[in-house]
Amino acid sequence: MIFRKISLFFVVFSLVSSFLSADKKQNLLVDTLPKLKTSKAPQSWNDAWNGFDPRAEPIDIEVLKEWEEDNVVLKVLRYRIGIFKGQKAMMAGVYGYPKEGKNLPGLLQIHGGGQYADYKAPLSNAKRGYASISISWAGRISAPGYRVSPLEVKLFWEGKTNDPRYKLTTDWGALDAYHAPSRNGKDAFPSIPVADWTLDSVPSPRNNSWFLATLGARRGLTFLELQPEIDPDKLGVYGHSMGGKLSVLTAGSDKRVKAVVPSCGGISDRYNTNPLHLATVSDPPSLRNIRCPILFQSPSNDFHGRINDLKTSINEIKSKDWRVACSPHHNHQDSAEYEVASQLWFDQYLKGSFKIPSTPQINVNLSKGKKPMVTLNIDESKVDSIDVFYTQQGQMDGKKDDSTNTKSRFWHHVPVLKSNDAWATELSIHSVGKPLWVYANVTYKLGKSITGAGYYYGMYKAEKFTLSSLMQTITPRALKEAKVVATMKPNLVIEDFKDDWKKEWFSYNKSKWGIRTHKIYDPVWAAPQKANLYFEVKAEMPNKMIVGLDSYVTEISLTGNNSWQGVKLRVSDFKNIEMKSKNAWSAFRQLRLNDVEQQRPPKGSRIAPRTLGAPWKGRAPEFRYLRWLIPS
């Protein structure tokens, strides 16, 4: 096969080059990217790649650590990114594959901002029959016996090889594509700087760190296709947050990608005020190049990959094979039934061992004098549940995204019933003067459970998976013109804890009973002036618990004995880490019930962390009558 011949050539080349003198080696370091012929920089994403061949240079693999775990071969290593301004750049990462594996699909995993390349990704992937590399574009690595934190990254920059904590990691050479922190103190992701540590002497997309990190990822694809255990025709890419955007940029610049899954990124970088950024390293130019199957993981309240940009992104891609998975209420995190969709996507398109159901189709009907009516057309194979979520807190004013609102908006839930071979439900709205955003989730049962490493490498076990419809957005003008009715009135009862109440609450740790909601931010449950917050709780044993409002918390002692205990709270009962309180309930957006929570001081503060509540004893508590009480 041609890739095996290339690999053999690289090995021979490396052996020969090892005998060359240092001067001759230096002469071989021809820059990876051609110099600009004029002072004009590339003006498009495609033009930025002119003259770059990701397979042209040796890969120069350096194995820094190797071990076996659960019949999986794992290696911390570095490969050559390229030569820039005469200096070699090297990408560190963690590579893993099942021992004795052959003709395996290969995965490139890209971490997010502030995160690490982590061995748990290739380890869990290998157990499912994949070879994969978790690349460390920012320099941080997490592996047994080889951890590179920001401290070790700084030691590497400073060349302090005598320090016992020193470790080799990603080396950007003459350039700087590091992040959190960057080596030169200036983040070159949102900007296009010109400096002695950038490639071009004029504003150029090749100076931007998105471009450089994407180049490093493309070289990662070359690394994968040269490994003897990998089928080079079956390569996939996935990543979270900044890694989600980099996944889109990589798939949008390299045809070797046969499937891609961005989570919480790759759809909302479309509002930068710099025209050169928009034309090159923003999301749309890459999205318009994507022809491979793509699955977007986009939680409803994510600040980085916003759900209202998802439909636009779908319209931009060239691929007809796409799905979306949108968890309600979540921001930049997910639970197992949403995270597992990435594994199923690769199983279908790289292994041919799974078939993903079709995308749920949603339609919102507006009729005079009636509530908005939702109808669905779904793939009914192995359906576990069907849910519709909607909000009237979506932003459609054309202004800059209100990040606080995006992360906090409340999504109402309604169950869906089948009548006359059609799935349908009505929506109770509180105003025709506010926009209406609606989407549906269909959850399917898995034949057997799947275990994997999540967005932040926490291990999850999924018994089911969820696919979403595209969100439908309806303007206030459309609601008024249709003369639909707004039937939802202000309500003092926040939660009755009956039926499907948990659908309007959420948790990122389902192994514990703690739960949270944004209901108090919705106008329907706005607190009257001078109201108290009241609920009743039943605990099996004496315990402590917390009630949290954003970063403000109060502690409650419970008597236990399986008897109902009333709790009445004033807004002044909730304190932040500085022991300060707010004057009004309207200042808060999220309500939490949990057993224990630690308040952390701001960075640089001398205030000690404060723990409230205590680890729970006995069965999970029961709740009822969560409401606002108006003093008589």
Enumerate the predicted regions with their spans.
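N-terminal cap/lid segment of alpha/beta-hydrolase-fold proteins
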Residues: 51-101
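Surface beta-strand/loop "capping" patches
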Residues: 347-390, 415-418, 483-487, 529
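Extracellular ligand-binding interfaces
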Residues: 493, 506-587, 592-610, 616-631
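Catalytic histidine neighborhood in serine/cysteine hydrolases
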Residues: 317-334
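The feature captures the conserved acid-bearing segment of alpha/beta-hydrolase catalytic domains
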Residues: 265, 269-317
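Short beta-strand element of the alpha/beta-hydrolase
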Residues: 92-95, 102-112, 132
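Primarily recognizes the serine-hydrolase "nucleophile elbow" in alpha/beta-hydrolase
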Residues: 115, 219-278
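Cap/lid segment of the alpha/beta-hydrolase catalytic domain
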Residues: 123-126, 131-214, 271-274
